[in-house]
Structures are given as C-alpha cells and as structure tokens.
C-alpha cells in the first residue's frame, strides 16, 4: 500500500505488522539499542529524561520533546509537515528532539524546549547545536486567518500577499532567542 515503505507510525491506518517490520529495520540499520517514542500532541511538554518504549506499540507519554544522555537510546520524533528539531550539546553526551508544528511555534516551544534541556543537564544554550529537519517551507505554510491564529509579534514572519508564514525563519529566531548561537543552528531546507 501507499504507506508501507518506511512508515513507522501505528496511528495512520497502516498494517501493524508492516509498521513493526519497518521499525525493526530502522533499528537494525541505525544500530541503536532502544528508542523513546512520544504521543505527540502539538504542545509544549518536554520530558528531560526520555523513557524507552517498545518497537511493537505507539508511544503513550503525551509530550512534544524529550532528551537523553543514555548512549544507544534513540529519540523518535514523527513529522509530516511539522518541524523536527534535533539538539545536541557540544560534548556529544546529551541530545534532545522536539516536535514543533505551527502551534508549537506559537507556544514558543523551541525556546522553552531548549531552556528545559539546558536547565536539566546544567549547561548553557551557547553550548548547543540545533538542526531543523524537513518540514513545511516558507512558500507553503498558508494561513488564511493569520491575524486570528497568530499574536501580533509573530506577524512579522507572515507574508500577507501569499498568505504564508516563514516557520523556518521563526524557528531560527526562537532558537536564537533561547540562547543558541546563529552559527550553531542548521536547517535542512526541504519542504514536505
């Protein structure tokens, strides 16, 4: 079927056996010992110590970000058009993963997620690298009621002519506001 290749979500109506097989294949190819999966809810809850979950079932902890310092524990974030943001301390010993949709941007989750990550492990945001993965690009993030959906300070990222929001630019600004250095923020500018 159309969802068979590489699908790792139990939540989209795919055959559960196919999903399990895809999850096992990813584990084998990437070589991690275990992974931690969340039940993503488009919010701002951050789990500072990720909880390993089974490859055989969906995540149940309702949150949109988690972190770990456990070697071999992979952090799973699932996205379609939302932004996956991976954070890593410069030592390589601490990592975090955030799921940021437009609601997460509006909640300023890139800021609070970085703050929670740094506070929990006791380091400065200036010591952190960030990579934003493929997501809905600036030319495609359409909002027909932007004034109703976004508070005024966010509208500088909105183009009224195209009715689109530059979520990539907004996220970079939020990561910088959280204290990350601009030269440590990267983006994979592939629009989903």
Where are these predicted regions, by residue range?
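Active-site microenvironment for binding and transforming phosphate-containing groups
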Residues: 1-192
């Amino acid at each position: 079927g159309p969802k068979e290749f590489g699908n790792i979500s139990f939540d989209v109506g795919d055959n559960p056996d196919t999903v399990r097989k895809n999850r096992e294949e990813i584990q084998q190819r990437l070589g991690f010992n275990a992974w931690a999966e969340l039940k993503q809810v488009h919010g701002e809850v951050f789990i500072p110590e990720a909880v390993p979950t089974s490859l055989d079932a969906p995540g149940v902890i309702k949150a949109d970000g988690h972190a770990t310092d456990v070697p071999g524990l992979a952090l799973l974030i699932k996205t379609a058009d939302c932004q996956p943001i991976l954070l890593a301390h410069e030592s390589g010993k601490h990592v975090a993963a955030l799921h940021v949709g437009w609601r997460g941007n509006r909640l300023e989750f890139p800021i609070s997620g970085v703050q929670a990550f740094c506070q929990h492990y006791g380091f400065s945001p200036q010591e952190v690298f960030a990579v934003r993965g493929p997501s809905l690009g600036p030319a495609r993030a359409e909002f027909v009621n932007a004034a109703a959906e976004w508070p005024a300070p966010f509208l500088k990222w909105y183009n009224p002519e195209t009715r689109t929001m530059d979520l990539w630019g907004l996220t970079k600004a939020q990561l910088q506001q959280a204290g990350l250095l601009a030269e440590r923020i990267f983006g994979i500018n592939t629009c989903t």
